[in-house]
Amino acid sequence: NNHFKPNRTNFDWLSRDADQVDKYINDPLCGFPCSAETWQQLLSGLIEISKKDQLDKIPHTLPMYLFGGDKDPVGRMGKGIPALEQKLRQTGHDNVTHKLYKEARHEMLNETCKDDVYQDVANWIEQQL
C-alpha cells in the first residue's frame, strides 16, 4: 500500500474504485489472515508452475492474453506481465499477447477502467476465432 499514499484503507492496492475496495473490505470471505502454511503452499505452487518443464506442458500454439495494471504491486508494478510473456516466448509459446493498463492496480475486473478491460478481452477472443 506504500505506493498509494495517502491511503484511505489497507486495501487501496486492489483498485482505484473506492466502492470496489469497500465491497472487498465488507465481504467476510475476503481480507482474512492466511496461515504460514497457506503462504508456503501458494508460493511453492507458483515456483513449481513457473518451471520450464511445467510451462512446456502448455500447448505451444495455445493463444494467451495476459493483462494487468502497471500499478499492481503483486504484478511488480507492471514488470510481471511482460516478464511472464518473455518466459512463455522463451519456452516456445509464440501466440502470447499482453496489455498493461496505465495506473490500474490489482483487480482488473474491478478497476475504474473495467469497461475497457472487458472490451479488450472480448476483442482479443474475437480475433482468436
Spans of features found by a protein language model:
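Acidic beta-to-alpha connecting loop that harbors the catalytic carboxylate
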Residues: 70-73, 104-105
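Active-site nucleophile elbow and catalytic-triad environment of alpha/beta-hydrolase enzymes
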Residues: 35-56
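Catalytic active-site module of serine/aspartate enzymes centered on a nucleophile-bearing elbow/loop
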Residues: 91, 95-129
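Alpha/beta-hydrolase-fold enzymes
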Residues: 1-29
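Short beta-strand/loop motif that positions the catalytic acidic residue
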Residues: 66-68
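Conserved alpha/beta-hydrolase "acid-adjacent" motif
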Residues: 73-83
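Short, proline-enriched alpha-helix->beta-strand connector loops that line the catalytic pocket
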Residues: 58-64, 91-94
